[in-house]
Amino acid sequence: MAMLNYDYGAMILNQLEAKRRIIKYLKEHNIPYMEGLCGDAPQITMLYKGCENCPDKVLESSIYFFSDCAECRVYYNANGAEWVRISNCRNDLFRLFNYINAMIWPCGADGVGNNLYKPQHLYTPRLYMTEDDCFDIVLATVVNYDFYNVAPLETEDFLTACLPELLNNLSIPIFLLLLGKITVERAISIIETEILDKRGTIL
């Protein structure tokens, strides 16, 4: 029987090609970015303006391209981190993070009425506070290059639209809790009634 000769090398996506594709997407969507290095890993940093619920109405994001995967982190600016640092309610914040990480499963969408692809739960980001005394609140997810190769547009939309939108939506309960204006129970109630449907999917 004749063997089919597939070129598996053509299907492999490495860190440099992944970075090239992301940059192409950012340029096409007019998303400002800067390039750099984190150790030996190429890095792209982006700024999202118009995030109405966030400190200074901005969010920042970095994508790190490691040898076997990429990691995307979305986080508040330095003023947001300062609010975390001076807060006396961080223990309550960690309880809220526990709820969010257990119950929220963001669903990526194309933003044009499902004409390009159907909504899917592609990635499972986690929300945490960094342990480096910077007090950053970070929403992070890991991207497998092979999966990115299979679902490129879905992945790019998720990293640059879905994740920032989710953190922006969570900002009101997060910072009201940090400022001592509401309880953990009230923060959870806000998320359940204004952000989630009954399946844990973003409204």
Put a short name on every predicted segment:
Residues 50-52, 78-80, 143-147:
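Beta-strand elements of well-folded, non-transmembrane domains
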Residues 1-24, 28, 74-97, 176-187:
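Long, low-complexity, intrinsically disordered polar/charged segments
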Residues 146-161:
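A short acidic/glycine-rich loop-to-helix N-cap element
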Residues 75-136:
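Short, internal acidic amphipathic alpha-helical interface segments
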Residues 137-141:
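Short, aliphatic-rich beta-strand segments
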Residues 175-203:
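Short, highly charged C-terminal tails/helix-capping segments
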Residues 158-177:
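A conserved amphipathic terminal alpha-helix motif
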Residues 1-74:
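Charge-rich, low-complexity N-terminal segments
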